[in-house]
Each structure stands twice: as C-alpha cells, then as structure tokens.
Amino acid sequence: MKVALIGYTGSVGKEIFDLLDKKNKIYTFNRANILTILNEEYDTVICSAPTSQKLKVNLDLIDYEDDLNNLCEMIKQVKTKNFILVSSQSILFEKNKYSDLQNKVLKTVSEFQPNNTIYLMDTLYGENLKKGFIYDVLNKEWTIIKKEVLYKYPELNNCYKPIENSDFYQQIKSLPDDLLNKLGYIENIYPNDKIFQTTYIYYLALNVVSNLDKSSGLISKIKETESFKGSEIKNIYYNSNNTILSKYFSNSKQKFKKRSHEKNIL
C-alpha cells in the first residue's frame, strides 16, 4: 500500500510512522515540502494536525495561515483512495485562531475527500506528548495555569503566555524547581466534575494504521478510549486499577524511578 503521512514528527504522527508496516511504501511530508505530495497518487493519505503549534498560533508567534492554505490546497488536489485526518475535539468548542484554522482543514477534508476518516479526540496521552492533563498529573507539572496564579506568583510571567479568549495561561518554558515547589499540586487546574475521554496515543495510532483502507467518517473515540471524571484521574494516579490509564501511570512511574536510580549511580 502506498501511504502519505503528513506531520510525521508530531506526537501522534511519530507513533503512526513507527507502526506503519514496512511492507507499505511510506512517503513523509511536512510544511516545507507539503505541495510535492501532488506529484504522486496514493492509496491513503494521513494528516496529523500539528497541535504543538497551537499556542504559538494563538499568540501570533508564527504565521500559520500560509502553511494552512498550502495544506488545504493539497487536500483539494491530492489523488488518494482514502484520506485520514487526526485532530482534536477542542477545535469544535474553543474560540481562538488555531481552532478557526483547523476547522478550515476539517471542512476542506469533508468537502473534497468524501472517502475520509476524521479522528476528533479529546484527552490524549503518551510518552511523546509533553503537555496536558495526564502529563501534568504524572510529572507534577503545570503546563496550564489560571490568571490568578500569576497574581500570586508574578515571577511566573517569564514562563507563561496567555491563551486567547480564556482566563488561562500556557507554559512556554520549564519551571525552575523552586517555582514548581511553590505551586504544589495541580488540583485546581483540571475540574473534578468534568468528564475527560482519555486515549493512549499508541492505541489511536494503532487504530489508524489498522484501518488504512477504510472510510469511517467522524470518530470521536475508539475501543480503548476511557472516560473519567477529573477527580477519578487524580485518584487513579495514587490508587491503581485495571484501566489502560492506570497501567500507563504505573509504567511511567517505574521508568521514572529507574532513571532516577541510574542518575544517582552516575
């Protein structure tokens, strides 16, 4: 099978690339060479949305519009039997520049690639994703804070930038240990009563790769997706059970202990 993969260096795209059967003929693309995809025909085109650029786009730190226009033009013209888009549910509910641009991608796929599968996932987690609820719980990090936290600790202004049209700020560089210790645990950032649909990126990528020749339309969860209240996720970190998320927490904590032990030996 001839497969084109756009966004192969991102947290989801990298996992998809690693899982693609070597029997497939794989072509990889990024924003620098995106339009060269039009030189060939494919069995399947996979596009993994670059969520790592979200904050920079909303703060106008990068000009994403030209890249997006090229992406949409490619979607309109590329010759493929199936088109797979991997994106986030947040683009449907958040009102910011990044969501507006990604919605344009979603609409272009729906209009010009009728044989499509569109994954709009909620809360993703995995080894290569260094942000979000699960990452913060596991690493005691604060990748997102509320405005009032900045009032209390003004020294944080160097580490955070505002998220457009919200009362939240997103981390742009790692916090020094002394600041991290001041902040303590992230209990107040992620609502206890909110429902989070969590999906391990490996299983999402496996689902994509296992269904390369199928057109399934809009997908908001897969078989391995688990739903929890925010309070349940925080509890699972301390009290293990048989869920996929709990196993991920346990494995990650074991890896952390091993790295710490090796570091102490050195």
Kindly label every feature range from the protein language model.
Residues 34-77, 89-93:
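NAD(P)H-binding glycine-rich loop region in Rossmannoid oxidoreductase-like domains
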Residues 72-101, 116-119:
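Conserved Rossmann-fold NAD(P)-dependent oxidoreductase catalytic core, especially the SDR/UDP-sugar
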